[in-house]
Structure formats: structure tokens, C-alpha cells
A protein has these predicted regions:
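Membrane-inserting effector segments that mediate pore formation, membrane fusion
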Residues: 91, 96-124
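Terminal, membrane-proximal amphipathic helices
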Residues: 1-91, 129-188
Length: 188
């Protein structure tokens, strides 16, 4: 009998499944590389007219968002499982997680520390926002503020590139699912 799209093979992690502890380790490592000081320097360059207190507050909000990413991902996986949508959601989250785990990306955390995770967090949040655009909201979370906040910090050029990465991932997953469904219909 052919495997259904949302069934996992025994003993195998589903496609795109990344250990969230790896993402938490990346966050911890980035915090160790310059911590808040490096993040505040980055923000000061992006927001040159901001007062010191505003820069510090922006850094604190940034860290809160970054620290929330593993929770967002875990909750999205859980929701996908509960709704039988793992064949769609897991590969999309896998793309976002792989970007998060790349040390050298558009804003490399290997060089920038915590500031290098701003683009990663933006990409995850934009992925979740796109999942909410279906016929029924996926998580129904209001992620507009964090997305806009991070877009301000990463800049429009990088944000556009990240948005394109999300759209490309969605198109890839759609093509893969169409191919799978075609094969399944031929097997039936």
C-alpha cells in the first residue's frame, strides 16, 4: 500500500525535520559572540537617529523575538500534526530551519553574533505568515509587528531577498506535493 502524504516512516524523521535544540544552540552561540553590545552596535547603524534607550529597547525586543523562534517552530509543527498538514508544513519549516542553521547567510551570525539572527528570525516569521494565508488561518497569530520590526532592522533589500526565499520554498514544496499526488493517483 502506498504511503499517505502525512504518514511518517517508522524510525525516520519527516522530511525537513530539524532538531530544535540545534536552533537553540545557534542562538546561544550567537549570544556568546558579542551579545547585546554587538546587537546594539548593529541597531545603532541601522537606526542612526535613535536615542540610546531606544537602541537598547530595540535590542531587547530583537532578543525576545529571536528567543521565540524555536517555540514558534515547535508550535507550528504541533499544529500541522493536529491538522494532518505535515506534508505541507514540515518541508516549509524545514527550509526556514535550514536557513537558520546556515552560519553564513545574508547577515552571518558567525560574524555579526545576535544581529546575524535577525534575518533568520524574519524568514521564519514570514514563512509562518504565509502559512496563515490559506483558506483557514494556520496559527492565527498576529506576526505583523515582529515582521515589520525585523524588516526595519534588516533593511528592505535583505527583506526582499528573504521574502523571495520564502516564496521559492513554497513553490518548491507545492511542486513536490503535486508530483507526490500525481504518483499516488497513478498508484490508486
Amino acid at each position: 500500500m502506498p504511503m499517505q502524504p502525512d504518514e511518517d516512516r517508522a524510525g525516520e524523521a519527516p522530511f525537513g525535520m530539524t532538531n530544535l535544540s540545534d536552533i537553540q544552540a545557534v542562538i546561544s552561540s550567537a549570544k556568546a559572540r558579542g551579545g547585546m553590545e554587538a546587537l546594539e552596535r548593529f541597531i545603532r547603524r541601522r537606526l542612526p537617529d535613535a536615542e540610546n534607550a531606544e537602541v537598547h529597547e530595540a535590542a531587547e525586543v530583537s532578543v525576545e523575538i529571536i528567543d521565540s523562534i524555536p517555540i514558534f517552530l515547535a508550535r507550528a509543527r504541533q499544529e500541522a500534526q493536529e491538522r494532518g498538514l505535515t506534508s505541507v508544513v514540515t518541508p516549509l519549516l524545514g527550509h526556514a530551519e535550514q536557513y537558520f542553521l546556515q552560519p553564513m547567510d545574508l547577515i552571518p551570525e558567525m560574524i555579526q553574533g545576535l544581529a546575524g539572527l535577525l534575518d533568520d528570525a524574519y524568514l521564519v516569521i514570514r514563512t509562518l505568515q504565509h502559512l496563515d494565508k490559506g483558506p483557514e488561518p494556520f496559527l492565527d497569530w498576529d506576526l505583523v509587528y515582529p515582521a515589520q520590526f525585523l524588516r526595519t532592522l534588516v533593511g528592505d533589500d535583505i527583506a526582499r531577498k528573504l521574502d523571495a526565499i520564502v516564496i521559492d520554498a513554497m513553490q518548491q514544496v507545492s511542486a513536490q506535493l503535486n508530483e507526490l499526488w500525481q504518483r499516488m493517483s497513478h498508484d490508486a
